[in-house]
Amino acid sequence: MRVMNFSAGPSNLPDEVLKEAQEHLYDYHGKGFSIMEVSHRGKVFEEVHFEAIKMAKELYGVNDDYEVLLMQGGASLQFAMIPMNLYMGGVCEFANTGVWTKKAIKEAEILGVNTKIVASSQESEFDHIPQFEFSDNADYAYICSNNTIYGTQYKCYPKTKSPLIIDASSDFFSKKIDFSNIAMLFGGVQKNAGISGLACAFVRKDMIERSKNKNIPSMLKYSIYAENDSLFNTPATFAIYMFNLEMKWLLNQGGLDKINEQNIQKAKILYDVIDESNGFYKGHAKKENRSLMNVSFNIAHDKNLEPVFVKEAEENGMIGLKGHKILGGIRASIYNSISIEKVQKLSEFMKNFAKKHA
């Protein structure tokens, strides 16, 4: 019997996806070889690769103004690749809402980028998304749409004439997005759309043009990925195969609007328990910025009970609930593949735990 996995990532995968991958791990569609053994230049893998890209575009409904790039190195490599490819010598603006924006700012500064932090919520332990405006003449404006550690999430994206770059690693493929204001949307796929080792980026073609004249290594150049359909070198073939299965699974669930409905319902179940606990539990994020993906909270009644909560949860078949080492506390990551039923079981455990220890 499989446990209920509330880990922040790599995270829970849908049972249907795991079972299909298990079958194809040994014999791919009766061909006598594993999907892990196929050449990235062969017809079998090319079908998997291009189908994955097609489904990703279909899910978000993006037009041909965007290239879908599949790259190794996860989202963290993008912290360096973005300034390498898109910095034009002006200023790059950031909204600092957590660890991942801080890392993106640091990488840009290592590369000599003129950075400007237009807003930050660091003084309150990143418990909210601050109010701010980007200028309209930055080389790019940068946000992280969902902050995994602190449990905050943008409910709408800032409007700006500057190219808007969004790190969506932890709410990737969790809802429909209006791309009209977005120059680049990227993320590691290991939370909502696959396994670790792969980053997916939707990059507007005018941003691809910027990279063409950049004197940077080929493997770090967006235009090289675009010109070669993300097949310039041997890609992460198994991770792309898993990404393909996840895209198919999302479409079979009814697409991103349906997934978003379920995500809203799941988050409400847990936040209701927190809010109705008479102060036993306390959420970290301000209510207006609460994440649908990561529910971070403390046992305000007695923080010494938090390791007891995690231990007893594991004994009840629920893992991955220990908060990040930076923030501590408890965190339930309820990504796309976590069912409403599993969230309900966690909520019942939370209620019973509070009743027992109040």
Curated annotation (Swiss-Prot):
L-glutamate binds at residue 41. Its main location: cytoplasm. Binds 1 pyridoxal phosphate per subunit. InterPro entries: Aminotrans_V_dom, Pser_aminoTfrase, PyrdxlP-dep_Trfase, PyrdxlP-dep_Trfase_major, PyrdxlP-dep_Trfase_small. Pyridoxal 5'-phosphate binds at residues 75-76, 100, 148, 167, 190, 233-234. The keyword Transferase applies. The gene is serC. Pathway: Amino-acid biosynthesis; L-serine biosynthesis; L-serine from 3-phospho-D-glycerate: step 2/3; Cofactor biosynthesis; pyridoxine 5'-phosphate biosynthesis; pyridoxine 5'-phosphate from D-erythrose 4-phosphate: step 3/5. The keyword Transferase applies. Its EC number is 2.6.1.52. It catalyses: O-phospho-L-serine + 2-oxoglutarate = 3-phosphooxypyruvate + L-glutamate; 4-(phosphooxy)-L-threonine + 2-oxoglutarate = (R)-3-hydroxy-2-oxo-4-phosphooxybutanoate + L-glutamate. This is Phosphoserine aminotransferase. Homodimer. GO terms for molecular function: O-phospho-L-serine:2-oxoglutarate aminotransferase activity; pyridoxal phosphate binding. Its cofactor is pyridoxal 5'-phosphate. Catalyzes the reversible conversion of 3-phosphohydroxypyruvate to phosphoserine and of 3-hydroxy-2-oxo-4-phosphonooxybutanoate to phosphohydroxythreonine. It is found in: Cytoplasm. GO terms for biological process: L-serine biosynthetic process; pyridoxine biosynthetic process. Pfam families: Aminotran_5. The modification N6-(pyridoxal phosphate)lysine is found at residue 191. It is an enzyme of class 2 (transferase). Belongs to the class-V pyridoxal-phosphate-dependent aminotransferase family. SerC subfamily. One of its GO terms (cellular component) is cytoplasm.
